């Protein structure tokens, strides 16, 4: 509704671009793209994506959720916006319905399949997952860290509020949850599809659905992008069906108290007695056309640190909180300055305001500033793909590995595209080879100094899927040849997994070398050329990723010895356990014990970081170099002297805690 004359409003929904047919449950107004103009974030329930209406600066808005939020909650409920990590940026949290305990997850989590996510993409919906989403703002790109932050599962949740409850200087998080009946209980859902349900009355249905009251959840901000559940230790574990909530200093002691609205029950009022830390409360009196100073921003500075807060009372779900801004200070005894941005053009500053008070500040545009474009951190990298002529798009086939193995943690049939770089044409510039998926040609991107020229590598079999590549001089003619590793978790024909070697004529023209590799049929993950037998030619370690249709059985990693240009499988002679080392994702050579011989570092899925130590003419497993309790989902290894002390260190990439 557009305010026409201060007394009347006009419906301009359609012409403003805000027409929305979703089940919208809440909204928040803030500057999503940091251009100085307020945008609108709308939380939508069910399958429809939430919306980020970006202000076009002409009275219209355009939904561009995908450019800023790469995935979302599936059934988005309440939303709150605040700077929880004190970097000056607005962060966002949206709520969903994922239970906290393993038993309730199995009881309540709906059956999903990968085809559903394909349908989302087909209908231009963005990826959505049944969990809370916490977005940390990094210069208008929002990274979702709810699992890392430990706030992703709080059951059927409604209203989130980010505020500093213990006055330590960092905003904590309180979430209301509950629903009178467990409508998503899988037993009830299955019953509704049965014959008996046809004869049931509405009351019969209601009586069958379980009633489960749950406590709301209070999280302490640990100041490291993680939150700690303090519901019990802060004595707030009261079972309820809670929806709206509001914050206010009800007893005028300086800290924030909480009012919670409960369905068919008495409201909660939580008096805050957590700490005696210092604080500052700020009440802004705005101009005549904005008396509450809505969307004004206050920033306080102390030493090298600062906090920000914005006057935005319309937060959470079906709720409005006060307009007084609260800053916890911990044990700090002074504030250097307080800056108020009344709007995009006017600001004022107060030096050394007293603490432990309610500071009331009347509108005073003493300083004119140009904030129409918020200053952004310069980017470290600039994409130059188009300028350099890197015209390539990987075309992956649809693969549904979960149909054959529902307990797989990921799809192993789309591990590509593989990529390798080297001076293939001998002109002094690095060229690039990109491996194609099944049905797609691999390509050679030849660099001529000013850009790249694309050539299809027709010698590589398009019936196979390229998942690993390595460049090295196979035939000792002074140029780089190509080892092509194939793989696909859905191939049941061994010949589709047989790796190949392509020989380079020195100008980037490749032909397949017949009969140089022995027959072995595994999904390749890494190729390492090195001289294992000391005869001055290059042998090969070829690690294996997964065994098709036999997950999680270990595939066989092989060691191939170069004998007069033909590779012989010497795996049993050199590798422990006949090469059945696990589902390997990466490997690197490194002289671990300083004996002058190359050892092998390996890692993979459901395993740790392991050393294959060279002992005379074979390798043995030696687990004494790494901690025993580091099993996990490891992806990659990089060897480098990171601390410049003359020895080699490791960077090992894991699936991570945000998962």
Residue ranges and their predicted role:
Residues 47-48, 98-101, 180-182, 266, ...:
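Short glycine/acidic-enriched loop and turn motifs that connect beta-strands
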Residues 35, 39-44, 92-95, 173-177, ...:
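Hydrophobic beta-strand segments that make up the repeating blades of beta-propeller
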Residues 141, 211-217, 221-418, 451-452, ...:
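Gly/Ser/Thr/Pro-enriched helix-cap/hinge segments flanking short amphipathic alpha-helices
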Residues 2, 25-34, 54, 76-86, ...:
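Beta-propeller blade termini
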Residues 1-30, 34-37, 43-45, 518-560, ...:
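Solenoidal tandem-repeat scaffolds enriched in leucines and small polar residues
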Residues 1-12, 49-64, 106-111, 131-143, ...:
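Beta-propeller blade repeat segments, especially FG-GAP/WD-type strand-to-loop junctions
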Residues 59-98, 122, 126-179, 240-277, ...:
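Repeat-solenoid scaffold signature
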Residues 10-22, 62-75, 115-126, 143-154, ...:
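Short loop/turn motifs that recur once per blade in beta-propeller domains
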């Amino acid at each position: 509704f557009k305010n026409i004359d201060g007394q009347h409003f006009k419906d301009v929904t359609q012409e403003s671009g805000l027409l929305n047919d979703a089940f919208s449950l809440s909204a928040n107004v803030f500057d999503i793209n940091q251009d100085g103009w307020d945008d609108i974030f709308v939380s939508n329930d069910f399958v429809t994506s939430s919306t980020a209406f970006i202000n076009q600066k002409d009275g219209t808005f355009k939904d561009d959720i995908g450019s800023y939020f790469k995935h979302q909650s599936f059934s988005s409920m309440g939303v709150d916006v605040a700077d929880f990590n004190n970097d000056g940026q607005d962060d966002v949290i949206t709520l969903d319905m994922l239970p906290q305990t393993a038993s309730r997850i199995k009881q309540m989590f709906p059956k999903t399949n990968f085809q559903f996510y394909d349908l989302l993409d087909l209908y231009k919906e963005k990826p959505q997952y049944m969990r809370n989403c916490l977005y940390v703002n990094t210069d208008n790109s929002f990274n979702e860290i709810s699992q890392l932050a430990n706030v992703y599962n709080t059951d059927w949740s409604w209203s989130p509020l980010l505020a500093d409850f213990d006055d330590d200087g960092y905003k904590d998080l309180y979430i209301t949850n509950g629903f009178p009946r467990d409508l998503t209980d899988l037993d009830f859902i299955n019953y509704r599809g049965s014959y008996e349900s046809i004869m049931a009355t509405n009351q019969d249905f209601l009586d069958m659905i379980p009633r489960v009251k749950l406590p709301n959840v209070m999280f302490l901000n640990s100041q490291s992008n993680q939150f700690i559940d303090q519901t019990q230790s802060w004595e707030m574990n009261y079972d309820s069906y809670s929806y709206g909530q509001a914050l206010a200093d009800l007893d005028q002691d300086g800290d924030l108290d909480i009012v919670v609205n409960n369905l068919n029950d008495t409201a909660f009022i939580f008096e805050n007695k957590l700490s005696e830390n210092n604080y500052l409360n700020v009440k802004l009196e705005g101009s005549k056309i904005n008396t509450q100073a809505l969307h004004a921003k206050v920033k306080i500075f102390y030493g090298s640190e600062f906090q920000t807060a914005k006057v935005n009372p319309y937060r959470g779900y079906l709720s409005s909180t006060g307009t007084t801004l609260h800053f916890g200070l911990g044990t700090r005894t002074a504030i250097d300055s307080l800056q108020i941005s009344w709007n995009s053009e006017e600001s004022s500053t107060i030096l050394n305001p007293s603490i432990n008070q309610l500071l009331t500040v009347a509108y005073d545009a003493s300083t004119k500033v140009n904030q129409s474009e918020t200053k952004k951190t310069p980017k470290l990298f600039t994409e130059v793909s188009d300028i350099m002529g890197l015209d390539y798009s990987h075309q992956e086939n649809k693969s549904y590995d979960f149909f054959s193995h529902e307990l797989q943690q990921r799809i192993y049939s789309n591990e590509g595209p593989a990529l390798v770089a080297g001076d293939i044409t001998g002109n002094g510039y690095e060229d690039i080879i990109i491996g194609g998926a099944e049905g797609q040609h691999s390509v050679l991107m030849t660099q001529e100094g000013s850009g790249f020229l694309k050539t299809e590598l027709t010698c590589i079999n398009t019936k196979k899927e390229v998942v690993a590549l390595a460049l090295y001089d196979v035939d000792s003619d002074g140029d780089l040849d190509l080892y092509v590793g194939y793989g696909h978790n859905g191939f049941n024909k061994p010949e589709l997994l047989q790796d190949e070697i392509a020989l380079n004529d020195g100008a980037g023209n490749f032909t397949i070398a017949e009969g140089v590799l022995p027959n072995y049929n595994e999904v390749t993950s890494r190729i390492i050329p090195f001289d294992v037998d000391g005869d001055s030619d290059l042998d090969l370690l070829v690690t294996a990723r997964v065994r098709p249709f036999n997950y999680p059985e270990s595939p066989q990693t092989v060691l191939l010895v170069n004998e007069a240009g033909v590779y012989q499988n010497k795996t049993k002679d050199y590798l422990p356990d006949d090469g059945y080392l696990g589902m390997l994702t990466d490997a690197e050579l490194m002289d671990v014990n300083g004996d002058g011989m190359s050892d092998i570092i390996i890692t993979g899925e459901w395993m740790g970081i392991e050393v294959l130590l060279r002992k005379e003419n074979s390798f043995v497993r030696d687990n004494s170099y790494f901690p025993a309790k580091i099993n996990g989902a490891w992806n990659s290894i990089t060897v480098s002297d990171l601390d410049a002390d003359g020895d080699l260190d490791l960077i090992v990439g894991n699936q991570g805690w945000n998962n």
